[in-house]
Amino acid sequence: MAAVDDDLGVSVVVCAYTEKRWMLTRAALDSALHQSPRPQQVLLVVDHNADLAARARRELTGVTVLESDGTPGLSGARNTGLKAATQPVTVFLDDDAEARPGWLESLVQPYSSPDVVATGGSVHPRWPGRRLRWLPPEFDWVVGCSYRGLPETVSVVRNPIGASMSLRTSLALEAGGFDDAVGRVGTSPRGCEETELAIRLTASRPGSVIFYVPAAAVDHHVSADRLRFGYFVSRCWHEGLSKADVVRMVGSSAGLERERRHTAVVIPAALMRELRSLAGGDAGAGMRMAATITGLSTVVAGYFTGRARLTGRSRKPSRSPLTGSIRPAVRSAAAPEE
């Protein structure tokens, strides 16, 4: 297999934190190594787990194993990979995702335009059994996957899905990398670290864009613990809290742009669809309607709870975990001060 063109070389980064996912992590790495064209560099960043790092060094070939030197959590691990990347484009693949053939080629193709600062691919759930009957497709983001409401063709978006995304390495480093004040730590269902960085990237470079490329597809393993309705509610709650963090950092215009459309257009259409299905005798439609209303209400409650917790706090300038320097506040026409 030929490598990706040197002018657009690629470093693939997989971040892992537990040996419980060892077989999935190996599958993720293998899927990256067997892309055609292949990446010039594949990195496994281990998030503060010495036993996992030692095992990876013993058993893996063709992969550079690094231990995270950042704050514990996904953002710190991703920053470690970003700093170690030697290629112009850094691609992030989740440790429980497997890239399909053609994934890498499709993901980096938009970089032929200098205005492209990041790309993201489609993420498809791989269920341990049947798909959850009660889960509305508009809420597949709860299990880390693409959801109904996203574009079905190559389109400009605000931010990619973290399970399968790429960034121009130098620009991401210049922007200060991922903010370790947001994002997952272990099994914590927080998120939005890629959203916050994506907004900073485009705000710092007028005219820059991020593309969603559905053909760059990965399969995301859905673990058994994510099949519970309790997880669904918890994930929605923490999404609301995370959105409050992002809005504090970048303003509500940019921080809630996509969410407003999803709430005003996609969710009402989903409820109408399920209402018609219920009238047609689909008993599962009632469960999906209930989940839709519960999910939306929980996200909103989490968001306003997060905002209330932040009320009265001074907005301290964000400090880059990569350089220690103060990041400029993101306040532009796209993200006005509230």
Place the predicted regions along the sequence by residue:
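Short, flexible, basic/aromatic active-site loop/helix in glycosyltransferases
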Residues: 121, 138-157
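Short aromatic/hydrophobic "clamp" motif used to bind/position activated sugar donors
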Residues: 90
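N-proximal low-complexity "stem/linker" segments adjacent to membrane-targeting elements
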Residues: 1-31
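A short, conserved alpha-helix in the catalytic core of glycosyltransferases
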Residues: 162-167, 171-175, 182-216
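Conserved donor NDP-sugar-binding/catalytic core segment of glycosyltransferases
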Residues: 102-135
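Glycine-rich, basic loop-to-helix element that forms the pyrophosphate-binding segment
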Residues: 68-85
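Non-catalytic, C-terminal membrane-associated alpha-helical segments of glycosyltransferases
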Residues: 235-238, 252-338
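Short, acidic, metal-binding catalytic loop of nucleotide-sugar glycosyltransferases
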Residues: 29-39
